[in-house]
Amino acid sequence: MTPKKFKKICKKYFTDPAFTMEDISSVADGSITISIFYYGYGVLRYCLDEDREKSFLLIADKFRYSEKYGKILPCRNDGSFIGIWNDYTKLYNVGHNSLIKIILSLIEKIKIAKVEYKKQLLEKDFENEG
C-alpha cells in the first residue's frame, strides 16, 4: 500500500481543516503508518499493514505516571491526560471527552477510506490482468 494514494482518499472524509495528515514509516518493523494531527496535536497513528489492521495508537506530546491507573499514560504539554487504549480498539476516557469522540470518528472515517482504497487496488489489479 502506498501512503500517498491512501492519504488522497482520506482527504475526502477529512473535511475539517483542523486535521492534518503526515506520512511516516515505522523504523522498527518497516510498516507504513499515517499520523493524524488535530490543531497541531498528534492524536492518532494508523497502520496501513493488513496484519495490523487494528493498530490505532494515541500519539501524545509526552507521557506521565497516573496514580489513578497505576501506569504511564499519554498526556498533553500541560500534563492533562488524553486517554488510554485497551487492546488497540477501545479508548477509555480520562478527561477529554470531545477529543475522544473526535478520535473515534477519525477511526471510522479511516476505515471507510481504507475500504475504498482496497476496492481501487482490486479494480486496478483486475484491469492489469485483462
Residue ranges of model-derived segments:
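Intrinsically disordered, low-complexity regulatory segments enriched in Ser/Thr/Pro
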Residues: 33-101
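Negatively charged, low-complexity tracts enriched in Asp/Glu with abundant Ser/Thr
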Residues: 1-35
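Short intrinsically disordered terminal tails
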Residues: 1, 119-130
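Ampiphathic alpha-helical segments that act as solvent-exposed interaction surfaces
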Residues: 3-16, 75-120
